[in-house]
């Protein structure tokens, strides 16, 4: 009996940290394979073997800047490039009717609107964090907020490596959104850090605290404080592959799906 063909995945932003992790994960996947690895036209890695660049054996998939060709030949696209590239990715995916996983964090509201529009024509998975564990963190935070939110002081802690440019992280922003929606609060209830002489803490306040130091892959904690006890819900990423595994899982989920904007809750059935 012949083996089923593997899902062909085009990876955009393939030379970065996440790109290298996804190349590595795809090298051992039984369901999917890397069909193209796309980098910018100015990349010093153009023409290099993406497997060797990712610290694994040669895979024969060299870095290219031909986005359209990569999308055209793929079953699904994973994009971990930059904000500036998002419009080009969406345009190509719509043109060739290919689903896409968007792993770019810190999107503007206009870019999120663009995802909504594009999702009327193609399947899209967008999540600020592709980790299976982090999405469980999201769900547990929602549950805790329903049970303890109105009797607790709530704080979010976001720790990442010193190279990360956006703050708070997309994951911290998602945690904030979950809390606000669950508790019926607004952005006016959110405080980013604290300094100086302040008034006493408002009972509906949600604090967000950002650390950028060392080489931390990503730690997030949501705290629920009451006078009698404290709940801490923490996720710590120990290997960047956790995000890569989730991204590949999301791509496999999308193949054959009808157009729409999906999140990791849909992918994981949460």
UniProtKB/Swiss-Prot annotation:
**Chain ranges passing through the membrane:** none
Query: Any idea of its EC number?
Result: 1.17.1.8
GO terms (molecular function) for this protein are:
4-hydroxy-tetrahydrodipicolinate reductase; NAD binding; NADP binding; oxidoreductase activity, acting on CH or CH2 groups, NAD or NADP as acceptor
Q: What is its main location?
A: cytoplasm
Signal sequence interval, chain numbering: none
Q: Does the keyword Ubl conjugation apply?
A: no
The positions flagged as active site in the entry are: 160, 164
What pathway or pathways are given for this protein in its record?
Amino-acid biosynthesis; L-lysine biosynthesis via DAP pathway; (S)-tetrahydrodipicolinate from L-aspartate: step 4/4
Output one GO BP term.
lysine biosynthetic process via diaminopimelate
What's its top-level EC category? oxidoreductase
Alphabetized Pfam families for the sequence: DapB_C, DapB_N
Q: Which residues bind NAD(+)?
A: 13-18, 103-105, 127-130
**Carries keyword Glycoprotein?**
no
- Listed binding positions for (S)-2,3,4,5-tetrahydrodipicolinate are 161, 170-171
Could you tell me what this protein does? Answer: Catalyzes the conversion of 4-hydroxy-tetrahydrodipicolinate (HTPA) to tetrahydrodipicolinate.
Family to which this protein belongs:
Belongs to the DapB family.
Please give the name of this protein.
4-hydroxy-tetrahydrodipicolinate reductase
The gene is dapB
């Amino acid at each position: 009996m012949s083996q089923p063909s593997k899902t062909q995945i085009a990876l955009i932003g393939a030379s970065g940290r996440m790109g290298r992790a996804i190349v590595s994960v795809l090298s051992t996947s039984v369901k999917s394979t890397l069909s193209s690895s796309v980098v910018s036209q100015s990349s010093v890695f153009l023409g290099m073997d993406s497997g060797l660049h990712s610290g694994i054996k040669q895979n024969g998939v060299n870095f290219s800047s031909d986005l359209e060709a990569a999308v055209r030949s793929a079953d699904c696209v994973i994009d971990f490039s930059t904000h500036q590239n998002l419009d080009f990715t969406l345009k190509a995916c719509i043109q060739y009717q290919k689903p896409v996983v968007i792993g770019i964090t810190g999107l503007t509201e206009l870019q999120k609107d663009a995802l909504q529009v594009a999702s009327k024509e193609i399947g899209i998975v967008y999540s600020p964090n592709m980790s299976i564990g982090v999405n469980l963190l999201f769900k547990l935070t929602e549950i805790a907020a329903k049970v303890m939110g109105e009797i607790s002081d709530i704080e979010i802690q976001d720790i990442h490596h010193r190279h990360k440019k956006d703050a708070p992280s997309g994951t911290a922003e998602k945690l904030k959104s979950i809390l606000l929606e669950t508790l019926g609060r607004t952005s006016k209830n959110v405080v980013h850090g604290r300094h100086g002489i302040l008034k006493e803490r408002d009972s509906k306040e949600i604090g967000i605290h950002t650390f950028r130091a060392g080489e931390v892959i990503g730690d997030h904690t949501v705290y629920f404080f009451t006078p009698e006890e404290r709940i801490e819900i923490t996720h710590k990423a120990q290997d960047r592959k956790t995000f890569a595994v989730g991204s590949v899982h999301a791509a496999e989920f999308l193949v054959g799906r009808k157009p729409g904007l999906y999140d990791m809750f849909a992918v994981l059935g949460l």
